[in-house]
């Protein structure tokens, strides 16, 4: 429901004004989302945080298409809570409890060896698809909100830019920078980066040298495979 909803709902919003799509057909799709997707997205996942963030992305995109303010606001609330329990800043101190952590944050975070700015709940699980999917979905949700006039980005700029730069450094160097017992970074790359870079660098003017280097040397030239809801970022947000 998360990955599919995060694709279907934005596509439906783009197609809403298509003259060949009758109003009753739009209403049928809205009803399908309410019937099939709402129950699946209604509560926070107790799995790892990338799953919940994907659900939040879908939830907010569907809320826009369905013109459902209550669902949209619930998505924002979930986004804010998960952001603080998934993306770490040293200034946070203790990580807040979250559904699924088993009352053991150290184990839930796969036993980091250093709690540093930009660490994620799944950095030490793998900083391949799990951690990259998580930040991709979180940023997609923030972008949905941005286009509805709600700025989720600015209040969490330190948190998200730290995550981008740490993860990009790890992926560029192949070295986890001492954050995990296994110091070898993933070689898997996904189209996770352009939306965040576009906002924080192009809109806000924040320097993100490692993120830029990763995008320019690894992401754009190699066209990472599209997977689930990570598919379109360079096309829509690279600013070509």
Language model features with spans:
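Aromatic-lined, polymer-binding surfaces characteristic
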Residues: 1-148
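CBM-like carbohydrate-recognition segments
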Residues: 152-240
């Amino acid at each position: 429901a998360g990955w599919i909803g995060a694709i279907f709902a934005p596509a439906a919003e783009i197609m809403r004004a298509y003259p060949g799509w009758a109003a009753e057909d739009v209403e049928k799709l809205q009803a399908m989302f309410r019937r099939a997707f709402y129950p699946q997205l209604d509560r926070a996942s107790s799995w790892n945080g990338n799953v919940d963030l994907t659900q939040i992305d879908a939830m907010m995109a569907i809320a826009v298409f369905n013109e459902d303010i209550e669902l949209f606001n619930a998505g924002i609330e979930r986004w804010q809570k998960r952001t603080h329990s998934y993306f770490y800043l040293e200034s946070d101190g203790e990580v807040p409890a979250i559904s699924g952590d088993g009352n053991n944050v150290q184990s839930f975070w796969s036993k980091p060896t250093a709690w540093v700015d930009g660490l994620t709940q799944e950095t030490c699980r793998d900083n391949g698809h799990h951690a990259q999917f998580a930040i991709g979905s979180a940023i997609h949700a923030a972008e949905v909100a941005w286009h509805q006039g709600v700025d989720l980005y600015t209040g969490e700029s330190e948190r998200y830019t730290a995550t981008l730069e740490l993860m990009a450094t790890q992926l560029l160097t192949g070295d986890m920078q001492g954050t995990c017992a296994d110091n070898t970074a993933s070689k898997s790359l996904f189209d996770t980066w352009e939306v965040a870079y576009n906002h924080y660098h192009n809109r806000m003017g924040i320097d993100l040298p490692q993120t830029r280097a990763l995008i320019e040397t690894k992401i754009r030239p190699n066209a990472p495979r599209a997977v689930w809801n990570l598919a379109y970022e360079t096309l829509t947000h690279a600013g070509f």
